[in-house]
Amino acid sequence: MPIRITGGLMRGRNVPSPDTSKTRPTASRTREALFNILQGVEGFRVLDLFAGTGIMGIEALSRGASHVVVVEMAHAQARLVLQAYKSLSLESKLTLFEKNALSLDKDSLCATEGFDLIYADPPFKDMDYPDLRPYWEWLNPGGVAVFEAPSRNLPAWVKEADEAGTVQVRRYGESSLVIYRA
């Protein structure tokens, strides 16, 4: 079932999505809300972790981001992401790593520049939700990290960071966006 791009120059175009219950693309309502919160991503370097369909990176490019680094460990999904970027003539703005996002370090991404936006959507139905705070160190000054987490069972580290005022949590049905600003 195709996924529709919600904004920017490619608004209304479709991205392929696999017919499987293992992939849970970010809902269009959540994507629109996120980019409204960000209020512009022009020129951003984006890191899309646990990319799945790759829709978040594509949305960012459609809205003016300059480059996206995609990390997806499932071979079939990584191929689908590459196909989607090629179908939209975006492959020159893509660096794709077929790796487990949890075993990455910044050096392995050749990312000496850092990132302006980091988006992570771990498969939280299949695993314990990981502590993603170490990725905050990969942000450029003024950068934003956004992690999609289960609304019904927010991880303890998210609750602690929310109570401390370190992050902002926005709920959208079954998913919540955990937003950290560097």
State each model region's role:
Residues M1-A182:
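Class I S-adenosyl-L-methionine-dependent methyltransferase catalytic core
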